[in-house]
Amino acid sequence: MNILKCPRIAGLLATALLGGNAWAGGCSPIVIDLGNDGIHLGEAGVGVYFDVNADGVRDHVQWVRRGGDEGFLALDRSGNGIVDDGAELFGVGTPLILEGRSAPNGFVGLAQYDSRQLGGNDDGLITDADAIWPQLRMWVDLDADGVSTLQEMRTLGSLGITALETIPKLRKYFDEAGNVIPYWAWAMQRARPGRVLMVDVFFRQLPKFSGT
């Protein structure tokens, strides 16, 4: 068994990587480098209000850059065509269906759909051989406002993505804005170079203001 596919162990690793508290680095979704030019996030201190951990409260967090080519891996659970909250991304807000709790990180949330109980084939990849594949989407928040629209949603096929790794590599990387990227893997593409980076970003939390 790969230890990173075990939610309990993955949660303990997240705690260690993020300095003793899994929430210390903020709230996480999986982000994919669609432009294959590296992961470029927003400026320090510039954020949005978005309910990343799906608890009904909008979090003030740093975000992706405006006009960038980074995309959020998404699953439209509500069927309304857009992303409502972190339960429809892959991160700490992702429900672990067979366990009745939230995932410790995005890759654990994604890996559950590779299990045979949820229509997968347990090969370490999410592909069109897994039942979840047709439901996956990419949210490219072009205006970086934290509000999903129909125009910002893409299918994986339209982006040439053919497979998503579910077992990440470990690292502890802080970008210049203070976001933490403890996990990374590859998303496979038909076009060259054949794969692009996918990371679980723990966005830095920002101060909340009254009235939000």
Where is each model-derived feature located?
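N-terminal signal peptide c-region/cleavage motif recognized by signal peptidases
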Residues: 19-21
